[in-house]
Amino acid sequence: MVLIPTVAVVVVVALVAGLVRFTNWRAQVRAAEAAQLELTRTYDFNPGNIISDGQFFNGSAMSQAEVQSFLDTQGGSLAAMTFDTSNESGEGLCADYTGTKGESAAAIIDQSARACKVSQKVLLTVMQKEQHLVTAVDPSDYQLMAAMGLNCPDTADCDPAYAGFFRQVYGAAKRYRYYLEHEEQYGYTAHNLNYIQYHPNAACGGAQVYIENKATALLYIYTPYQPNIAALAAGNGTGDSCSSYGNRNFALIYTCLLYTSDAADDSLR
């Protein structure tokens, strides 16, 4: 009788266990992808691919003049507003920002986008999602102070280091780059299964989502909930007590206001 060496047995067992885990993982991925496909067909919303990398990380998606024209057409007060900006370090994530007095909102949006290689359309979408700034007439001080919702928790004041329109816009663009460089530090990763809640109340449940790209992972790091069926069925309206709307509204605003055919490029820029 020939005895198989113990080491060989251990290796075989490990290989079999690994194969079983991979097979189970692939089955879960296929189930998540099937559910996401059904949501896309029914509600035109894919929780695993809210926006492509090519759309999100295109710092040349619009020119400053195009940003200004877009703001003008929306009828909000932001189109005519100016802000004093300051010198800010890009901290190796973005190009440094050179401040000046009386800089237009369009210039701040465009320069922040180019400095951090984040789409102007994304920045416009986020400020509309967070504070309705694109369309707001006579926005409040708080709307401007918390323009992008950056470091502005629901239960406390905004961090003074990020308060104000300029610091919110440039800071948010830089934060997205930080997330991109340090994705592994957060709970949501691309090309992987991620359990994403429907609401801050864990009792509302959630679902596994196969996140298809880095841009979508960043949106979940920034706003860590997915819309439930009630939120999706409501369109741009109100769902139920377990609904959240941040990422649904991002998709709706981006698609309705800012989507153009340049989205075909799905590369990281």
What are these regions (language model features)?
Residues 3-18:
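Hydrophobic membrane-insertion alpha-helices, especially the h-region
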Residues 17-107:
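N-terminal export signals and maturation junctions of secreted/periplasmic proteins
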Residues 64, 68, 106-110, 120-124, ...:
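Extracytoplasmic/secreted envelope proteins and their assembly/folding machinery
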Residues 74-81, 179, 183, 261:
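Short secondary-structure junctions and interdomain/linker hinges
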Residues 123-258:
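Catalytic and binding regions of secreted/periplasmic enzymes and modules that target cell-wall glycans
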Residues 259-266:
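Conserved small/polar residues in nucleotide/adenosyl-binding loops
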